[in-house]
Amino acid sequence: MKHIVKHIHFVGIGGAGMSGIAEVLANLGYAVSGSDLSRNAVTDRLEALGARIAIGHDAANIEGANAVVVSTAVRSDNPEVLAARAKRVPIVQRAVMLAELMRLKQGIAIAGTHGKTTTTSLVASVLAAGGLDPTFVIGGRLISAGANARLGTGDFIVAEADESDASFLNLYPVIEVITNIDADHMDTYGHDFARLKQAFIEFTQRLPFYGSAVVCVDDPNVRQIIPFISKPVVRYGLSPDAQVRAEDIDARDGRMHFTVIREGRAPLAVVLNMPGLHNVQNALAAIAIATDLGVSDDAIQLALAEFNGVGRRFQRYGEVPSADGGQYTLIDDYGHHPVEMAATIAAARGAFPGRRLVLAFQPHRYTRTRDCFDDFVNVLSTVDALVLTEVYAAGEAAIPTASGDALSRALRAAGKVDPVFVATVDDVPDALAKVARNGDVVITMGAGSIGGVPAKLVQHIQQKA
């Protein structure tokens, strides 16, 4: 590719999916440029690596580019897209560019409705501990690496495979993981769940004859597609028929202790440095791959025991002063689907037994809130106190019956929690100051702008003091 393409431009370079690819390409020696609507830590990092960053979208930004990379979130009338089309500069979908990177190495693609980022991070960490030095492209910041992407010297590239727009069908990895299959992003599949499951089957058909599909048999929808997978299958999970499974699971001090049972191998005692049964499952996927690739048991144990997590995935901010003179434990999480939220809440209950759980939640997308409305009511009713914001639209038109206020009214009618509704994320710190008290566990949650709240909370409390 390099003899033809020397300069690659990214429209929306600050996004999690785009920035990782841009960083790997920059480290491979390509000239990288990009634009976004605002600066953030990611754009600053890319600039330090030599990328040319423009704030705002303008036709002039693509000057000199041999290819322009876009995601499905970029509109066709974007001025940079229009300029590329006018100049006959190739416009490349993000997943197609990721597929090009995978052609340079042996790809390990992590798919599933939930858990992709954490599982990708665990796989990358375990392979790194085993000396395989993988390249990785992750949808969140791997805390130990301080980045969401890295160019390694080894044979493997580990990356997330995105089913939300069916773009994972562009990838041709040698190992695939399917963590679970759930109803999300259903607009892509015509609101037909059978079409979604068929897409995952087609994803496995991208594997070569020597490849393998590593699948979580605890998920009933994954279990249903196994008979239709024609390539070798490795089953992992907590189920008795899992080939890589966890037994004797014990949650202690925010960690998960368990024994790994693998066919033809001695039992392996593991301590995972993060809470939650769902993370045990995610770790089992990494263990299955690492075992297949010859990583030692010692390296597996070390990587999982020292795993520092991923940004915004049950990310701990430590103790924050509460308005009553005490302090509460602050956690931030990206969860935005009821299934993910339930797993995070269960993990918090297990990690902090007996403590009051306060959730500040920003719903993400009106269509998701509409499609999962009753499930949101059910999961949000399981916390002890709730601050709820208006929906983060993500470019969608408002749906009055699926607004934050409508969700708040439904929760109040259900009678299990009395939500404090705030119109904007900017109001969350004030609301939490009134709700949170000494000894609480406070979780800020959502895929939108609420991710900026935790860093403001300490400053907010100090200003109020």
Swiss-Prot record:
Q: Which key words are in the record?
A: ATP-binding, Cell cycle, Cell division, Cell shape, Cell wall biogenesis/degradation, Cytoplasm, Ligase, Nucleotide-binding, Peptidoglycan synthesis
Instruction: Report which superkingdom the organism of origin falls in.
Output: Bacteria
> For ATP, which residues are the binding ones?
G112, T113, H114, G115, K116, T117, T118
- Entry's Pfam families? Mur_ligase, Mur_ligase_C, Mur_ligase_M
Give the enzyme's EC designation.
Answer: 6.3.2.8
* GO MF annotations in UniProt: ATP binding; UDP-N-acetylmuramate-L-alanine ligase activity
One GO term under biological process is:
peptidoglycan biosynthetic process
Q: What class of enzyme is it?
A: ligase
Any one annotated GO CC term: cytoplasm
* SUPFAM superfamilies for this protein: MurCD N-terminal domain (SSF51984), MurD-like peptide ligases, catalytic domain (SSF53623), MurD-like peptide ligases, peptide-binding domain (SSF53244)
Q: Which reaction does it catalyse?
A: UDP-N-acetyl-alpha-D-muramate + L-alanine + ATP = UDP-N-acetyl-alpha-D-muramoyl-L-alanine + ADP + phosphate + H(+)
Location in the cell: Cytoplasm
Q: Where does this protein act, in terms of pathway?
A: Cell wall biogenesis; peptidoglycan biosynthesis
Q: Which Gene3D superfamilies does this UniProt record tie to the protein?
A: Mur ligase, C-terminal domain, Mur-like, catalytic domain, NAD(P)-binding Rossmann-like Domain
Principal localisation: cytoplasm
Provide the function of this protein. Answer: Cell wall formation.
| PANTHER family membership | UDP-N-ACETYLMURAMATE--L-ALANINE LIGASE, UDP-N-ACETYLMURAMATE--L-ALANINE LIGASE-RELATED
Family named by the database record: Belongs to the MurCDEF family.
The entry's protein name is: UDP-N-acetylmuramate--L-alanine ligase
